[in-house]
């Protein structure tokens, strides 16, 4: 059943305003005659005004779906009986107006509430368009989300790759550092071996006349080369007698400079002007040895680094083979040969040669005196770093015996720099203790720095390098003045094995000059011994009038020879 509410407005001829309110309840009341609806009417007659049309204000009703014939009763709630007639008229009016009202209201309200077909189609199109837009927006959001997720995955993968590359690069850097350390260690070992092997070509060594060569079973073993310090002029190596001992003793002996001017205790002093020459059999594959029962000393010459096809090695091997076939008393023949050689030489040449050799031995003697005077030198007290490095250097040498001293110093310096002050404090305390102890022992000690070394040669002050270059040039000039052909007139002593000095000298004359070779590292003091004789009797060998002195010794005479190193 539909609920309807409306307003009825009528304009009666009497120009009276009437208001009818009709209420039709939802639930019908049942009476004797059947279904009926309750209708309530309120009638009101207000004061009439001229010019204002009367009208119905409001009417509430419920229209049943049946016809108006089904309406049974009209119950009016009025106080008076006079109103019953009016209610009947009103009910008739309502019954007459109900179909028109229903028709009017049904059309308007249905159109408003339900809408027409055109409006529904338009709304459907709008809804479809909105659904399409929402679908597109959803697809865009999904694609953007997937792209964002893919980008995040790609960025994460790139970060992982970069981290992996960085880790690999770090590992490669660590490996390269380790390889560099190993290569540096190998380079140090090779440098040491090169320093041992890289020695100048040597002449035949000069031995004292009372010393004889004995058979040494150790000479067939490979000979260890001796480390050298660099010099600017070539010299022949003297005999170096070493005792076989522990490895540490060998290191200490090779690290110290050799005293070449000291004479052996079991040999007899002899004239310096005419030294006697002996051959030391050393080759690349081993050499022969010479026997003698008069002296127990053993001769080892470090010539193992020379090649097999070297002219020096061939000459020395040939001389050794010739000397090996001599009789048991070679001293007699050699003394006789030396005497005859001195007799045949002019007196001036002998004196010049003796003076040249005396000059060179005097230089070595000065060095000996200087080295000997160093024993009275007062050393400075050790500082904290030296105290700490003393034990650390020993530990590194025990772990790496072949490591170079420069590498050890670099390692110690970096370690000391990385130490904290608290770790260095005990060593500073030890430094203070050593300083106090040194002050107690030497109260008058004053540190004097080493003076600059200068040489005065023929009234000119020269540096040490200039002095060495000058001496080298003089030795070259002296060597060029010798004539080998003048030795052919000398008388050689007879030899039962057919040994002749001429063949030996011919072999020596073919040897390459050692003046063009500058050794890199030589720690051995050497003496140049000349076999050849000057052709010119006078002026071939100049007298040495060189003075090597310190800055405060410049007033000494030209004939005095002084070398000061400290």
From Swiss-Prot:
InterPro entries assigned: HMG_box_dom, HMG_box_dom_sf, SOX/SOX-like_TF
DNA-binding region ranges: 378-446
Annotated localization: Nucleus
SUPFAM superfamilies linked: HMG-box
Keywords: DNA-binding, Nucleus, Transcription, Transcription regulation
Positions of the UniProt region annotated as Disordered: 47-69, 242-301, 545-566
Keyword Aminoacyl-tRNA synthetase attached: no
Keyword Repeat: no
Top-rank taxon, per record: Eukaryota
One GO CC term on file: nucleus
One Gene Ontology molecular-function label: sequence-specific DNA binding
Polar residues bias (residue ranges): 254-274
Subunit structure: Homodimer.
Function: Transcription factor that binds to DNA at the consensus sequence 5'-AACAAT-3'.
Protein's name according to its UniProt entry: Transcription factor Sox-13
